[in-house]
């Protein structure tokens, strides 16, 4: 079972933590790891699902991005960062002709930056992605006409309904930067934060070959099973008991690392982390359904056949009514970026609220905010965390947790009004002054159930 990047402590390691009540052997996860310095450059890649069910969510995205993403970044950072913004779809060439809506030839998409509708484009945008950056003489260098919100609205207005129902968001993100599109490589700047935003109502189905989509007339007696999106779950995820076609609720579901058909999650984690010289400059966010509960039931009547197994929707998105199924692989990937991931459930808030929190979280990382990101909640306190004073050369010393309100030379974890944009509103601070160039790095035990 793959877990987020974390560490397991032994008894000896507890001595430096004093007498705090910590469960020996439990896993800590990094929740605060500030950049060495504040940065003002941001590369943003949107990976958008263009399957038919996503039309309301795509419209909500383009309607809200101007005020809830770009304007919020400008407000939080005291000015708009130097921006590169690109859009791709979840469609890639799957090397298997005849799959409705899916690419069998390298004609478009396949990791290519998209600028609006394929037949029209965006005449006001000069290039394959948006540029809005300081020109060095007090102004801005832009490659678009009108406002940034208007330009993004056009760029992100794609052919919804034309997309493949076997979504490949992770493979699409890789193909955007793996060298097959040389004109896109200048999008990435070594000194800029990279923010990857996945927007989809289904889990990742990034296949390692076209064999997953073979045998289009297969039934329940076929090893592959019916050619529906359930194949992505059956061969991309493993749950306790490993009987994917049996109806009912599943437990312990995680990416199937030994899948003969889907690419392992670690491959995408390593690729994305390697896009910047400093992996801490890579941030991954997602708008998708929570990975639980996982329930297998009947295909909706009239879609294929009611006796065929199907992954049941986890929830329905507010305002848009989009049904979303559990994104187990995608969630596992996002959580491989400790203190650099933001999960925004498609089920619990509207698009404008999701973009607001993503913008504020991104600005927080860029400005070295003390707000914790990751698997923490309002019950996370100093007693459930450990902290380090990390020097510029990477050496570190263990810090003790504060036991009283006035104690100095220690770290404290607790609620903070400045972190209200996070799901938990928790921050970590050092009481005292760290040496110049030193950083406060914090690990915490995950909440029960995560």
Regions flagged by a language model, labelled:
Residues 14-16:
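C-terminal motif of bacterial Sec signal peptides marking the signal peptidase cleavage site
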Residues 2-8, 329:
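Sec-dependent signal peptide recognition
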Residues 18-450:
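Divalent cation-coordinating acidic motifs and surrounding scaffolds
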């Amino acid at each position: 079972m793959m877990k987020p990047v974390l560490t397991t402590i032994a008894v000896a390691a507890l001595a430096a933590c004093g007498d705090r009540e910590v469960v020996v052997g439990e896993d800590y996860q990094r929740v605060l790891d500030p950049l060495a310095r504040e940065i003002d450059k941001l590369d943003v890649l949107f990976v958008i699902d263009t399957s038919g069910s996503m039309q309301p969510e795509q419209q909500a995205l383009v309607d809200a991005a101007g005020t809830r993403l770009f304007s919020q970044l400008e407000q939080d950072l005291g000015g708009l960062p130097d921006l590169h913004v690109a859009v791709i779809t979840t469609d890639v060439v799957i090397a298997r002709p005849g799959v409705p809506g899916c690419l069998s030839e390298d004609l478009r998409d396949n990791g290519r930056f998209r600028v609006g509708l394929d037949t029209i484009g965006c005449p006001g945008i000069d290039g394959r992605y948006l540029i809005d950056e300081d020109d060095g003489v007090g102004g801005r260098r832009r490659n678009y006409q009108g406002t940034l919100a208007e330009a993004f609205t056009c760029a992100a207005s794609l052919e919804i309904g034309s997309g493949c129902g076997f979504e490949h968001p992770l493979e699409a993100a890789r193909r955007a930067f793996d060298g097959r599109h040389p004109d896109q490589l200048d999008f990435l700047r070594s000194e800029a934060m990279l923010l990857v935003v996945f927007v989809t109502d289904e889990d990742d189905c990034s296949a390692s070959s076209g064999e997953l989509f073979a045998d289009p007339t297969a039934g329940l007696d076929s090893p592959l099973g019916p050619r529906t999106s359930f194949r992505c779950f059956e061969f991309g995820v493993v749950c306790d008991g490993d009987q994917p076609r049996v109806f009912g609720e599943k437990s312990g579901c995680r990416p199937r690392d030994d899948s003969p058909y889907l690419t392992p999650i670690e491959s995408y984690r390593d690729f994305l982390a390697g896009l910047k010289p400093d992996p801490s400059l890579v941030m991954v966010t997602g708008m998708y359904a929570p990975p639980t509960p996982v329930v297998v039931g009947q295909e909706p009547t009239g879609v294929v056949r009611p006796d065929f197994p199907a992954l049941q929707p986890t929830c329905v998105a507010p305002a848009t009514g989009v049904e979303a199924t559990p994104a187990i692989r995608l969630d596992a990937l996002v959580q491989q970026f400790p203190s650099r991931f933001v999960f925004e459930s498609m089920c619990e808030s509207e698009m404008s609220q999701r973009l607001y929190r993503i913008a504020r979280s991104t600005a927080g990382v860029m400005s070295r905010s003390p707000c914790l990101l990751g698997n923490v909640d309002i019950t996370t306190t100093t007693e459930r965390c450990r902290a380090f004073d990390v020097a510029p050369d990477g050496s570190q010393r263990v810090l003790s947790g504060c036991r009283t309100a006035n104690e100095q030379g220690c770290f404290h974890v607790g609620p903070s009004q400045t972190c209200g944009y996070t799901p938990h509103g928790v921050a970590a601070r050092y009481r005292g002054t760290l040496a110049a160039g030193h950083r406060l790095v914090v690990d915490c035990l995950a909440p029960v159930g995560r």
